[in-house]
UniProtKB/Swiss-Prot annotation:
Keywords: Amino-acid transport, ATP-binding, Cell membrane, Membrane, Nucleotide-binding, Translocase, Transport
Substrates-to-products reaction catalysed: L-methionine(out) + ATP + H2O = L-methionine(in) + ADP + phosphate + H(+); D-methionine(out) + ATP + H2O = D-methionine(in) + ADP + phosphate + H(+)
Taxonomic placement: Bacteria, Bacillati, Actinomycetota, Actinomycetes, Mycobacteriales
Protein known as: Methionine import ATP-binding protein MetN
Taxonomic source organism: Nocardia farcinica (strain IFM 10152)
MF-aspect GO terms: ABC-type D-methionine transporter activity; ATP binding; ATP hydrolysis activity
Length: 334
């Protein structure tokens, strides 16, 4: 089914049972992952992120609901069918999961051996993948001879070996330093752009979402509390969990204690306004100047994401009450 999404969850719940105790990890998840997109799934520890990934590749079975991959059900079908579908899904792990006794080339070749590829074809594919991830010179190196970033690139190449249509990256950069994280994320974007692979990025880091995701699903207590474009979630988060994640990386709105400090420092009225490509503050500040209202930018920041601008600015407005009210009205009308 060419028009089917890459993955679709319909009212999916997952309950783990230990003796007589039950723990619901995911609650009635409805989620459609489009072909060719990078979807970020973010949440704190215990939110259900990894369970969601394991449901996609059939390593866990849902307690209720249905899951389809590329239009094909993976629930209520024989295990042999699930294994067949799993061949079209690549997996990247946080701890690399490389065979220490195999070289970089040997690790990449392993799934091709399992799939029954002939030797000559395997060797050609391994060489192609090593070049793609920039590790041609490390073909004969063992994992202990590689840096963390190089190990993860081997893991990515291995995940791509059989040309899957879907790639699951579960905390793939959590064990890496910031510079190496950037390199791995750039590689994921390259895979998506050049190979057309759909990617699901599981993470607890909003910087990762900002760097690669087209859309983001925010998980909290086993529920999707927000699902929107990455820009929309950053520019105007609707849920408290999304706002908390955005605040960890942007810092463009003063926290309550910072707002109290600013209030003590400035005699004017403090107001925080959101700005973006369509909502500037130039006209409102012109109104302020003409009305004799003094203004000062005391906090804030502006960012660019997906070729669009957004941010928040906190102003101190000082002047006659009616003039300040006129400026506030102008800001509200933007």
């Amino acid at each position: 089914m060419s028009d089917a999404p890459a993955v679709e969850f319909r009212s999916v719940s997952k309950v783990f049972r230990t003796g007589k105790r039950e723990h619901t990890v995911l609650h009635e998840i409805d989620l459609r992952i489009e072909r060719g997109e990078i979807l970020g799934v973010i949440g704190y520890s215990g939110a259900g992120k990894s369970t969601l990934a394991r449901l996609i590749n059939g390593l866990e079975k849902p307690t209720a609901g249905t899951i389809e991959v590329a239009g094909t059900p993976i629930t209520g079908v024989p295990e042999a069918r699930v294994r067949q579908l799993r061949r079209d899904i690549g997996m990247i792990f946080q701890q690399f999961n490389l065979f220490r006794s195999r070289t970089a080339a040997g690790n990449i070749e392993y799934p091709l051996k399992v799939a029954g590829w002939p030797r000559a074809k395997r060797k050609a594919r391994v060489a192609e993948l090593l070049e793609f991830v920039g590790l041609t010179d490390k073909a004969r190196s063992y994992p202990d001879q590689l840096s963390g970033g190089q190990k993860q690139r081997v893991g990515i190449a291995r995940a791509l070996a059989t040309s899957p249509a879907l790639l699951l990256a579960d905390e793939a950069t959590s064990a890496l330093d910031p510079e190496t994280t950037g390199e791995v994320l750039a590689l994921l974007r390259k895979i998506n752009t050049e190979l057309g692979v759909t990617i699901v990025v599981i993470t607890h880091e909003m910087d990762v979402i900002r760097a690669v995701a087209d859309r983001v699903a925010v998980l909290a207590d086993g529920r999707i509390v927000e699902l929107a474009s990455t820009f929309d979630v950053f520019a105007a988060p609707r849920s408290a969990p999304a706002r908390a994640f955005v605040d960890t990386v942007l810092h463009n709105r003063p926290a309550p204690e910072e707002l109290r400090r600013l209030d003590a420092l400035h005699t004017g009225r403090l107001v925080t306004v959101d700005v973006d490509d369509k909502r500037g503050i130039g006209a409102a500040l012109t109104t302020a100047a003409r009305a004799g209202v003094r203004f000062e930018v005391v906090y804030g920041g502006v960012s660019t994401l997906q070729d669009k601008t957004f941010g928040s600015i906190t102003l101190a407005l000082d002047g006659p009450d009616d003039a300040v009210a006129a400026v506030l009205a102008a800001l509200d009308e933007r």
